């Protein structure tokens, strides 16, 4: 039924009529007929093009152009026009041609417009003016003659203004219109209501008291406002104790002071700058602007007018005593601030002074506009990046500033400013006073800048700076200065989610109790400053707050022609975020194309997600995926696209989901392919140096680039730099690669154990975080059940120790082994796995646990084993065949621990996933567990997508299937195994994010149980891998979790077996520690909590 309602074929005659409306701006009347189509066809195609439809004349329908203004803009314009005299009305009509119409550009995309949107708006204004003044008798007749009275928001606006002007209600009695300030629900009309009624009639429940499944799934049945969003996605407001008025003044932190002893600068050793100049931090490669000095940059009268309003903001209630010799100075904040560390629900909002004085602050607008203009002229790239980054609702007077620090008679000690946007600059100006000296000095430059009233300094606030001495301080002196900047905390995921909840509450307020009948809703419609964000009405309630916040972050960047990185921890639903973004973009630009690049194993996951959410309204005209399951269908879709590109058929939007290996061939075939949007899943791949994928993507003319990654840092910080630089090319011009690498080295030095590097590491960490916040949406936390993550150090049997000695394996020699040396890993699995590996006998092991070679080459390799090795291998095979399983298992510490874990999980009637990097280990584990009669299924990297899908379904539905054995590096991606709540990492890789991806197959959305992770580590071969992992995890925490972290030293790790809080688990650890392997070594030597392998600094 859904497909029938949402995918209708369109007649060529109807297409031609709608093309004319869209291009000419004229209205058209259509009637249901075989050549035009039925009502569903007409409404569906009209909606897709964003045209409007009215249910007149009788028996027919009138098609109108899209309205090129947001609802609140149109309301304000109509109110002004209806209240104006004839001369003023002419001026208003003339001014229509001087403004921009972004909605118009969207609605006529790929159609050459033959009319100016101002003409259409003028017609609406004139109609509204006539309607408001018309006699009651004429109003009634207008219902049958004017289609404007049948479309939203025009009919609501006319009603509202007439009611205020004349006290006469709107004549139409059949309209249950929401308030005129409602957000725009796309193409609301009489005709659409008729379609809704028809669909609703098809889905009425026949059973007593209950709704049928059809009714619940119908896209045309109404949605009550309370069901539009998840409950926790809507802001809660306690009217009795309104938290937005809580006084937090004085708790803001804007400085980073690096000593408890205040350091004051003097002019000694500093050059005094008095002439306009630009300063860089170094010569040659890697230089960047750190200061721009503009004496007399702002007229003095502009400064003093603003000072009269801003000076009262400077009080002694603040936390800046350390920058004033221990005494609180006169200082304060104006605008917006991020109270992220305060225990209040509303963390991102106006300062108290701003809340109380918004009306007066308008007098400071000329100053702010002037400073903003100077900034854009003298540091254009910094200004551009700041304009891209700043959320619209935090812009002061439409500038790139969110916050102003006001200082009065305050000679600051040496400090750096904390929390400023590092791709931008702070803008300092003295706006009032009589004084001598008190110059602003920057230590690194060895320069002091003379600042009098009207002088301006743009500078990098992360550099240590302070004021020089005041000359003749005994004479009464006065000095008021301001610093304007962007607070990066306002772009945090906390603020994004808070803002999203606030917008959702406004939407529900505007809807009041009106049932939502439309299939699509603009969830940004409550704030006209935000770009539109359309989502299917029935999908909105399935989007978690973090997903809605991520969508809001993305569309604000794309509206400003910038990309971004979406760094959400695995399992939070990045794919649904991206699909919803695609839906909104195609809703606004129905003929555009979108390119999604993803690893081949994940393509089927995208298809599954698209199909899963289709029942909630997430539909696309063409969704083309190269998943390899149906190559004929894929080719047919490409041929259809070719016909549309060649104008043989009407062009519709396409979403292409392809893997990077196919991209070059795709671009050769479609040489003029120009996507509106590029999304790269597992986007850390574009961070690699010399990446051919990046080279191919760079040839596409597309600025809107979105990177999705739960693990944007894989090995080092430079990867994040390359990611951000790829989504926005401008960042490299304000932070050169050489400078970023210096910062990364400071962090790495501390991460690797140099405690003396702590101060530099903290400074570098804060700088990088403040630099990337405008372009990286980070949400590394989740609200999933608890995760218990353990390191299990396993012993070695006597046979394993014998081979370790032969290989010369010690903790020291392991550090010298290459990553391609796999013998130690196979030996840690089991001696049988090691012997099979060096004899290349995998194939025969899989086929029947025999070492009989099938080819001369294999015979030669087997014969190269020493005689005792050959005998041992045959003996091990016989052990399994003769069901001497305990003896066989006790030859390996890892295998013994693994089997006991599996049997424990089986006894608890739970499920387990085992990840391993090596085919030999996977085979041995599978055979051993099968011999133990544990129902086990194995998925390897070479397995087809269909097999993987069947594995997911079987594992979820078959209660007897206890264990899945998966390939870590390949099968871990794109799979959902939340049926399991135990995960074993049988071996670990150098990159901890590979292991993290594996764990996320079970620990993700929809997981309802606590998850336990067991990382099996041998005493020798895996310890160096663990050391490499913890270093990278510490780096990851430093940069993405904002926690200064380092590797734990060996003596800092504490065995947790004895103090385990869970009694059953404590007993289990004790049992494993008393279990002996062949040769008498304990199977389990130590148990550590994995998170303790990385230490966070206070």
UniProtKB/Swiss-Prot annotation:
Region (Thymine dioxygenase): 1-540
Intracellular or extracellular location(s): Nucleus
Phenotype reported upon loss of the gene: Does not lead to death. The genome contains reduced level of DNA base J in the DNA.
GO CC annotation terms, alphabetical: nucleus
Helicase C-terminal domain segment(s): 897-1057
Binding site for 2-oxoglutarate: 479
GO molecular function ontology, one term from the record: helicase activity
Family annotation (CDD domains): DEXHc_Snf, JBP, SF2_C_SNF
Binding site for Fe cation: 415, 417, 465
Keywords, in A-Z order: ATP-binding, Dioxygenase, DNA-binding, Helicase, Hydrolase, Iron, Metal-binding, Nucleotide-binding, Nucleus, Oxidoreductase
InterPro entries: 2OGFeDO_JBP1/TET_oxygenase_dom, Helicase_ATP-bd, Helicase_C-like, P-loop_NTPase, SNF2-like_sf, SNF2/RAD54-like_C, SNF2_N, SNF2_RAD54_helicase_repair
GO biological processes: base J metabolic process; double-strand break repair via homologous recombination; reciprocal meiotic recombination
Keyword presence, Hydrolase: yes
Entry cofactors: Fe(2+)
Function: Dioxygenase that catalyzes the first step of DNA base J (beta-d-glucosyl-HOMedU) biosynthesis by converting thymine to 5-hydroxymethyluracil (HOMedU). DNA base J is a hypermodified thymidine residue found in the genome of kinetoplastid parasites, which is localized primarily to repetitive DNA, namely the telomeres, and is implicated in the regulation of antigenic variation. Probably also acts as a DNA helicase. Recognizes and binds specific regions of the genome, hydrolyzes ATP and allows the DNA base J de novo synthesis.
Similarity annotation: In the C-terminal section; belongs to the SNF2/RAD54 helicase family.
Listed name of the protein: Bifunctional helicase and thymine dioxygenase JBP2
């Amino acid at each position: 039924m859904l497909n029938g309602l949402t995918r209708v074929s369109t007649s060529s005659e109807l297409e031609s009529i709608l093309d004319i409306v869209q291009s000419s701006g004229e209205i058209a009347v259509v009637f249901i007929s075989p050549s035009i189509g039925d009502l569903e066809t007409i409404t569906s195609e009209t909606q897709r093009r964003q045209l409007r439809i009215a249910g007149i004349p009788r028996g027919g329908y009138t098609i109108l152009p899209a309205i090129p203004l947001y609802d609140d803009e149109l309301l304000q314009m109509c109110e002004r026009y209806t209240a104006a005299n004839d001369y003023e009305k002419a001026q208003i009509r003339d001014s229509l041609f001087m403004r921009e119409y972004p909605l118009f550009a969207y609605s006529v995309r790929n159609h050459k417009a033959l009319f100016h949107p101002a003409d259409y708006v003028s017609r609406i204004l004139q109609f509204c003016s006539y309607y408001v003044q018309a006699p009651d008798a004429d109003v009634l007749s207008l219902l049958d003659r004017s289609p404007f009275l049948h479309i939203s928001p025009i009919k609501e606006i006319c009603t509202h203004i007439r009611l205020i002007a004349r006290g006469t209600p709107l004549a139409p009695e059949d309209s249950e219109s929401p308030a005129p300030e409602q957000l725009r629900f796309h193409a609301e009309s009489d005709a659409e209501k008729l379609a809704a009624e028809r669909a609703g009639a098809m889905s009425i429940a026949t059973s007593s008291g209950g709704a049928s499944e059809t009714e619940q799934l119908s896209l045309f049945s109404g949605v009550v406002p309370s069901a539009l969003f998840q409950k926790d996605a809507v802001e809660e407001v306690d009217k009795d104790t309104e938290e937005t008025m809580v006084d937090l003044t004085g708790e803001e932190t804007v400085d980073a002071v690096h000593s408890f002893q205040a350091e004051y600068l003097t002019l000694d050793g500093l050059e005094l700058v008095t002439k306009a100049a630009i300063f860089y931090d170094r010569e040659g490669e890697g230089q960047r602007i750190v200061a721009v000095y503009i004496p007399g940059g702002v007229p003095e009268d502009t400064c003093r007018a603003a000072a009269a309003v801003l000076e009262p903001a400077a009080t002694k209630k603040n936390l800046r005593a350390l920058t004033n010799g221990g005494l609180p100075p006169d200082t304060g904040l104006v605008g917006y601030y991020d109270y992220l560390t305060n225990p209040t629900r509303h963390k991102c909002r106006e300062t108290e002074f701003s809340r109380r004085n918004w009306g007066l602050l308008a007098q400071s607008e000329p100053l702010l506009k002037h400073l903003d203009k100077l900034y854009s002229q003298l540091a254009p790239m910094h200004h551009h990046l700041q304009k891209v980054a700043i959320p619209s609702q935090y812009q002061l007077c439409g500038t790139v500033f969110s916050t102003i620090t006001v200082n009065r008679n305050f000679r600051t000690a040496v400090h750096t400013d904390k929390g400023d946007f590092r791709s931008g600059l702070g803008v300092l100006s003295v706006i009032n006073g009589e004084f001598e000296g008190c110059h602003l000095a920057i230590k690194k430059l060895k320069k002091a800048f003379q600042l009098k009233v009207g002088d301006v300094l743009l500078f990098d606030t992360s550099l240590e700076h302070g004021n020089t001495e005041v000359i003749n301080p005994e004479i009464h002196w006065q000095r008021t200065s301001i610093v304007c900047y962007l607070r990066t905390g306002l772009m945090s995921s906390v603020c994004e989610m808070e803002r999203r909840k606030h917008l959702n509450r406004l939407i529900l307020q505007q809807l009041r109790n009106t049932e939502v009948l439309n299939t699509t809703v603009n969830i940004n419609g409550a704030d006209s400053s935000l770009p539109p964000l359309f989502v299917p009405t029935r999908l909105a309630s399935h989007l978690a707050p973090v997903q809605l916040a991520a969508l809001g972050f993305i569309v604000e960047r794309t509206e400003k022609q910038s990309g971004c990185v979406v760094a959400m921890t695995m399992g939070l639903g990045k794919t649904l975020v991206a699909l919803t973004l695609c839906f909104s973009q195609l809703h606004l630009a129905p003929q555009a194309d979108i390119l999604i690049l993803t690893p081949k194993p994940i393509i089927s996951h995208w298809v599954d997600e698209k199909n899963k959410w289709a029942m909630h309204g997430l539909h696309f005209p063409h969704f083309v995926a190269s998943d390899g399951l149906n190559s004929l269908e894929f080719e047919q879709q490409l041929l259809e696209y070719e016909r549309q590109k060649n104008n043989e058929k009407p062009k519709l939007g396409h979403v292409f989901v392809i893997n990077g290996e196919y991209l070059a061939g795709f671009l050769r075939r479609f040489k003029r392919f120009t996507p509106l949007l590029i999304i790269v899943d597992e986007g850390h791949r574009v961070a690699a140096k010399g990446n051919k994928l990046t080279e191919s993507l760079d040839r596409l003319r597309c600025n809107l680039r979105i990177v999705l990654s739960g693990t944007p840092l894989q090995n080092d910080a430079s990867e994040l730099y390359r990611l951000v630089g790829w989504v926005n090319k401008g960042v490299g011009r304000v932070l050169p690669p050489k400078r970023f690498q210096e910062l990364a080295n400071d962090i790495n030095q501390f991460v690797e154990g140099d405690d003396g590097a702590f101060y530099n590491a903290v400074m570098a960490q804060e700088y990088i975080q403040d630099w990337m916040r405008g372009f990286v949406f980070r949400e590394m936390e989740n609200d999933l059940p608890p995760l218990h993550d353990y390191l299990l150090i396993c012993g070695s049997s006597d046979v394993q120790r014998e081979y370790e000695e032969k290989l010369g394996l010690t903790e020291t020699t392991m550090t010298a082994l290459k990553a391609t040396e796999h013998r130690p890993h196979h030996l840690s699995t089991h001696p049988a796995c090691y012997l099979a590996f060096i004899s290349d006998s995998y194939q025969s092991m899989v086929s029947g646990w025999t070492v009989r070679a099938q080819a001369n080459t294999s015979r030669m390799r087997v014969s190269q084993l020493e005689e005792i090795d050959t005998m041992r291998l045959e003996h091990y095979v016989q052990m399994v065949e003769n069901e001497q399983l305990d003896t066989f298992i006790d030859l390996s510490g890892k295998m013994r621990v693994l089997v006991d874990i599996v049997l424990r999980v089986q006894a608890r009637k739970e499920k387990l996933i085992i990840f391993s990097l090596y085919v030999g280990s996977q085979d041995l584990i599978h055979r051993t567990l099968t011999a133990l009669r544990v129902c086990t299924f194995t998925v390897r990297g070479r397995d087809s997508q269909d097999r993987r899908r069947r594995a997911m379904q079987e594992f979820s539905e078959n209660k007897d299937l206890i264990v899945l054995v998966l390939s870590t590096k390949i099968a871990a991606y794109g799979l959902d195994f939340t049926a399991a709540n135990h995960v074993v990492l049988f071996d670990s890789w150098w990159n901890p994010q590979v292991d993290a991806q594996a764990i996320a197959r079970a620990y993700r959305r929809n997981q309802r149980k606590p998850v336990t992770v067991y990382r099996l580590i041998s005493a020798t071969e895996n310890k160096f891998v663990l050391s490499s992992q913890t270093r990278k995890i510490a780096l990851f925490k430093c940069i993405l979790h904002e926690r200064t972290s380092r590797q734990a030293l060996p003596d800092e790790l504490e065995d947790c077996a004895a103090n385990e809080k869970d009694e059953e688990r404590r007993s289990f650890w004790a049992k494993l520690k008393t279990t002996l392997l062949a040769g008498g070594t304990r199977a389990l030597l130590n148990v550590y909590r994995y998170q303790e392998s990385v230490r966070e600094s206070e």
